[in-house]
Amino acid sequence: MAVETIQKPETTTKRKIAPRYRVLLHNDDFNPMEYVVMVLMQTVPSLTQPQAVDIMMEAHTNGTGLVITCDIEPAEFYCEQLKSHGLSSSIEPDD
């Protein structure tokens, strides 16, 4: 009796890279600049004061400033935290 060996086809599994999202700070005419910098640093602990100042100035000058690019869950968290402190923020896909 002959034994037949069945070869298992080789499969490669590639992980799909999770999409990234941009957290944006929008300019407003209500909050003092120092307050915006403080909230940015409290919300995103990895930000230094000079980085927070740059983000605030970018929003002040151009209408929006890029706070951070990250996965969807932290992006939603950062956006909601900024909003809870009275700042205007949104998220968008990073292309």
UniProtKB/Swiss-Prot annotation:
InterPro entries: ClpS, ClpS_core, Ribosomal_bL12_C/ClpS-like. It comes from the Bacteria. SUPFAM superfamilies: ClpS-like. One of its GO terms (biological process) is proteolysis. Pfam families: ClpS (PF02617). Belongs to the ClpS family. Binds to the N-terminal domain of the chaperone ClpA. Involved in the modulation of the specificity of the ClpAP-mediated ATP-dependent protein degradation. This is ATP-dependent Clp protease adapter protein ClpS. The gene is clpS.
